A protein has these predicted regions:
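Carbohydrate-active catalytic/glycan-binding domains of CAZyme proteins
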Residues: 1-242
Length: 242
């Protein structure tokens, strides 16, 4: 408490003359400050933390977790991505314990990235971006009783997207979201999105959008309670408010 953290990726490309394509590499690091206006610390590089768009989760038991992405294949060729989590030692800025691959996404399971974990209603909620950052951009969410899973997805995923709308819709490519809870109990979502002009151009690129959300019950699975009877298992999930 009393410390601000920024965790981000330093990503770069370099040309290998022996290969026709660019070689991509990255480093994830954390900086801290007592005031968001600064001064900020020197970067603490987290060795072994690959992937992009990481986040930190501070659990109520005092443990801190680094949440990032990894690629079962080549993310830049086949789009497959997954989310991993591992405990982080903030005293020494090192990953400790085992690494767990916790989710691959909900719908098309491509370019799963930008993870955020929240603990609400007695469960861990994992929010991710999926589908790339263009017209198939979307926000997915899953829930679990344990931070390392297994995570179960609501049947109403994606909880935010514009992929089903015309490319002429005035806001499109919505995704890469985060949730914020106000002191009065209200919830809001911030996400990326593009605004089109009359000719369909997005001159401002990706902008940040703000919208209210509410938590509603969603079925995650059906469980058999007798030979002839099944009942739904439901969790609360955030949805964009009207």
């Amino acid at each position: 408490k009393g410390t601000f953290y920024i965790v981000t990726t330093n990503m770069y490309s370099q040309i290998d003359r022996n290969k026709p394509n660019k070689t991509k590499s990255n480093t994830n690091f954390i900086i801290t400050a007592k005031n968001p206006a600064g001064p900020w610390s020197e970067p603490h590089v987290i060795e072994g933390a690959g992937g992009i768009d990481p986040d930190l989760f501070f659990d109520d038991n005092g443990k801190v977790y680094f949440v990032g992405t990894h690629n079962p294949g080549d993310m830049y060729s086949n789009g497959i991505g997954a989310i991993w989590a591992q405990e982080l030692d903030l005293e020494n800025w090192k990953l400790v314990g085992d690494r767990h691959s916790i989710w691959e996404g909900a719908c098309d399971k491509r370019h799963t990235e930008g993870p955020h974990i929240y603990k609400e209603h007695g469960k861990y909620y994992l929010l991710v971006a999926e589908g790339g950052t263009s017209f198939h951009h979307a926000v997915m969410m899953a829930a679990s009783d344990d931070i390392f899973g297994p995570y179960e997805t609501g049947l109403r995923n994606p909880i935010l997207t514009s992929r089903h709308l015309s490319k002429k819709n005035w806001v499109h490519s919505t995704g890469h979201a985060d949730l914020v809870k106000l002191k009065d109990g209200r919830w809001f979502m911030v996400s990326l999105g593009k605004r089109n002009d009359r000719d369909g151009h997005s001159n401002m690129g990706r902008e940040t959008h703000l919208m209210p959300v509410v938590w509603e019950s969603q079925i995650v699975r059906w469980q058999q309670i007798s030979k002839t009877k099944w009942e739904p298992v439901s969790y609360l999930f955030p949805v964009v408010a009207p």
